């Protein structure tokens, strides 16, 4: 089943990042842009400075799970969002990550 909420193409990432609307906190940088759909589309980027591939994939899985679990709260936001992960994510627990990410996404509204 194809997930229509995920941004995967490089040109889509570049288009949103070049739009230059950002919001930041200690563990995430979020680039965003309006879209014409009635739902949130997201892309996740974890740089190579953050651990090895196993650690990076774990962080991406956690972020995807946070977004899935909170889809009722954030699902109605009509934005394209790129989530860049900072190194401080490695020191935090899942609950803290969840609160931090959801708070940032709600601020975009």
Swiss-Prot record:
Please name the GO terms that the record assigns under molecular function.
3'-tRNA processing endoribonuclease activity; ribonuclease P activity; tRNA binding
One GO process term, biological-process aspect = tRNA 5'-leader removal
Q: Which domain of life is it from?
A: Bacteria
Q: Can you state which reaction this protein catalyses?
A: Endonucleolytic cleavage of RNA, removing 5'-extranucleotides from tRNA precursor
Transmembrane annotation, as ranges? none
The UniProt family comment states: Belongs to the RnpA family.
What is this protein identified as?
Ribonuclease P protein component
Q: Which organism is it from?
A: Mycoplasma mycoides subsp. mycoides SC (strain CCUG 32753 / NCTC 10114 / PG1)
Q: Name the gene.
A: rnpA
């Amino acid at each position: 089943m194809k997930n229509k909420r995920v941004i995967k193409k490089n040109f889509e990432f570049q288009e949103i990042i070049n739009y230059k609307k950002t919001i930041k906190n200690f563990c995430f940088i979020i680039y965003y842009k309006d879209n014409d759909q009635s739902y949130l589309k997201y892309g996740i980027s974890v740089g190579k400075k953050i651990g090895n591939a196993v650690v990076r994939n774990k962080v991406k899985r956690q972020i995807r799970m946070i977004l899935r679990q909170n889809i009722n709260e954030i699902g109605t936001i009509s934005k394209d969002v790129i989530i860049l992960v900072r190194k401080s994510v490695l020191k935090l627990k899942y609950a803290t990550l969840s609160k931090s990410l959801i708070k940032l996404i709600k601020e975009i509204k």
